[in-house]
Amino acid sequence: MERRLFLYWLIMVLAVMTAVFVVLIVAGVFSNDAGKLGGTLSVQQKNTTMTFNKLIDTLNAQNLALSEQITREVSDVLETEERTFKDLDNNPELITRIEERMCFYLQTIVRSRSCSGAYFILDATTNTEAPGADRSRMGLYLRSGNVGTDGMANQYITFFRGVADVARKENIQMHNRWNLEFDIDNVPGYEILMDFDGRRILDSCYLSNRVTLSGTWEQVVLLSIPVVLEGKVRGVCGVELSELFFNMVFPSVES
């Protein structure tokens, strides 16, 4: 799966660089400097590959640590409340307790600037009788609210999915497309990861194709892994790489 992710982004980078190269040729900018530019592009490609490999290593480590942290926090909450995982359904208070416990960890990941968002989803819902409840799942999704040409120096976090009281408690700005829960039909790879056999988690990472984030115009790729509790998959977690974030980390080569 790592190889698939690497190839996906590398192809995108090379496509952008090739387009720039063609435009400059047509414009006659470097009729006598083609060799020099070719060398520049080669160096740029090598640097991009190195940067991307470092990014993937960071994301894999973050995803694994997040999955393990969710397992610990959920187990602790359920043990303290003398509940089972099935008791999360139709229990807004218990769901809120778990989301409060996990909010700090998601904020830490987003602030690390190694991605444009972080999320977790558990196989439970606030109201099993609500319309669409069979495809609705609890969880948190935090996103960076300042990814663009000016970088992330003035980064702030937006609350995209989760219990609104958690956002208020943590003083996090609500995303203008906020929803309480995830529609798993809009979460690439969710069903695949829920069928994970419970062995080595890193072997099950799932890289989505580029998709439009639900309710927005933004293009993103999601890198997800399972959340395992007592040997059974109980949800998924992961990070978001938006197109804006990608363009910031891997800028086009300048002439």
Model-derived segments and their meaning:
Residues 161-238, 248:
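Extracytoplasmic/periplasmic ligand-binding sensor regions of membrane-associated signaling proteins
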Residues 101-105, 236, 240-255:
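Solvent-exposed, extracytoplasmic
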Residues 52, 107-109, 211-216:
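Residues embedded in well-ordered secondary-structure elements
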Residues 125, 230, 242-244:
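Short coil/turn motifs at secondary-structure junctions
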Residues 47, 98-103, 204, 220-222:
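Short amphipathic alpha-helical surface micro-motifs
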Residues 2-97, 114:
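Juxtamembrane extracytoplasmic/periplasmic/luminal helical "stalk" adjacent to the first N-terminal
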Residues 60-197, 253:
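Extracytoplasmic/periplasmic sensory segments of membrane signal-transduction proteins
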